[in-house]
Amino acid sequence: MANTPSAQKAVRKVAARTQINRARRSRVRAFMRKFYDALAGGDKVSAEVAFKNFEPEIMRAVSKGVFHKNTAARKVSRLAKRLKALSV
């Protein structure tokens, strides 16, 4: 347990940031799930819409420090590859 007042405050701040980051990560996963659901349905138009909604959401998470930029780039690349395969 934190002994000094500043350490106690740091613990509180970390807990608050953890909640925010968990919500952001969950939101990104929800957008990814919508994309995969559209892919499973075979609907190209809804998959494109889901992809266009997913990409800025994950980049927003990168700018907030939730994901590393390479992780986001890899996820976007893989989803784009799946979208392209659907349209062929």
From Swiss-Prot:
Keyword Iron listed = no
Q: Which Pfam families match?
A: Ribosomal_S20p
Share an example GO biological-process annotation for this protein.
translation
What SUPFAM superfamilies is this protein classified in? Ribosomal protein S20
Q: Which InterPro entries match?
A: Ribosomal_bS20, Ribosomal_bS20_sf
Show which residues constitute the signal peptide: none
What cellular-component terms does GO give this entry? small ribosomal subunit
This protein's source sits in the domain of life called Bacteria
Keywords annotated in UniProt: Ribonucleoprotein, Ribosomal protein, RNA-binding, rRNA-binding
Gene Ontology molecular function: any one: structural constituent of ribosome
* Job of this protein: Binds directly to 16S ribosomal RNA.
Give the record's family classification.
Belongs to the bacterial ribosomal protein bS20 family.
> Which NCBIfam families does the protein's record reference?
S20
- Indicate what this protein is called per its UniProt record: Small ribosomal subunit protein bS20
Q: Which organism is it from?
A: Bartonella quintana (strain Toulouse) (Rochalimaea quintana)
Give the classification, highest ranks: Bacteria, Pseudomonadati, Pseudomonadota, Alphaproteobacteria, Hyphomicrobiales
- Whichever gene encodes this chain, its name is rpsT
